[in-house]
Amino acid sequence: METWQELKVTVKREGEELVSNLLIELGAQGVAIEDSMDYVGNVDRFGEIFPEVEQQEEIVVTAYYPETVDVAAVEADLQARLAELTDFMDLGEVKMGTTALTEEDWADNWKKYYEPARITHDLTIVPSWTDYEATAGEKIIKLDPGMAFGTGTHPTTKMSLFALEQVLRGGETVLDVGTGSGVLSIASSLLGAKEIFAYDLDDVAVRVAQENIELNTGMENIHVAAGDLLKGVEIEADVIVANILADILIHLIDDAYRLVKDEGYLIMSGIIKDKWDMVRQSAESAGFFLETHMVQGEWNTCVFKKTKDISGVIGG
């Protein structure tokens, strides 16, 4: 029986998606998240209340590697990459540890962390292996969380989904910048967008997004390609959405203003509290007006509008 290696990385909650993505880039065959916030105050869809769980600042990202991988080298590489990012994000004290698993352990271990999750009024994210029956009006997004790049339950992704639900009415063209898992593109299609163009700089993310899109039926209107933000893009859009780090977001704002149609929207997420003013000022300097601002914990998500009628915007 084949042996697998389990690498556990403990970081502050803000580092969940960053660490998950890096572990996948470093060859992980699956990633699981342990977060006490997933259970605090939760009630499942059948009304059962989860046991009391003490809220922790830290989460555990667990990655799974074949026995042929030098996990010590992965640890060293991950530590080096995280050290380069300390100016952009407070990860706290990073702790790592490894355990050997059998094939059977691996097959069951990471899947136990994922259950169907109702994210917004309309949208529910369902692991690809789950037999789930939707209720009336419920829109299902099937994802393979083992591929990482965003499982849809991180605050930045949740708020992005709420924002899309707010602005999409049907028939729109959407640009999804830094698509990751493809979850925002899939949601846009389910919410009625006519065409979605998804971009990511990471070739692995492009592949993962395409595979997740193929898990969902009727997604032929989503086009995925490698791309560096919006450089070289000439497609006019009704909505542009980007869930990436604030220091990267500010570099796409001018191109977003160029491409978004009049009365169109720019949704930005992935913004920690200390970077919010910087992002807001950059967007307003480009000509956008803030329409909606959402906050969950340390994270900010915003909906900016390109409009001459500022009566309905914040500060208008």
UniProtKB/Swiss-Prot annotation:
Its EC number is 2.1.1.-. CDD domains: AdoMet_MTases. InterPro entries: Ribosomal_L11_MeTrfase_PrmA, Ribosomal_PrmA_MeTrfase, SAM-dependent_MTases_sf. One of its GO terms (molecular function) is protein-lysine N-methyltransferase activity. It is an enzyme of class 2 (transferase). It comes from the Bacteria. It catalyses: L-lysyl-[protein] + 3 S-adenosyl-L-methionine = N(6),N(6),N(6)-trimethyl-L-lysyl-[protein] + 3 S-adenosyl-L-homocysteine + 3 H(+). It is found in: Cytoplasm. Methylates ribosomal protein L11. This is Ribosomal protein L11 methyltransferase. It comes from Streptococcus pneumoniae (strain Taiwan19F-14).
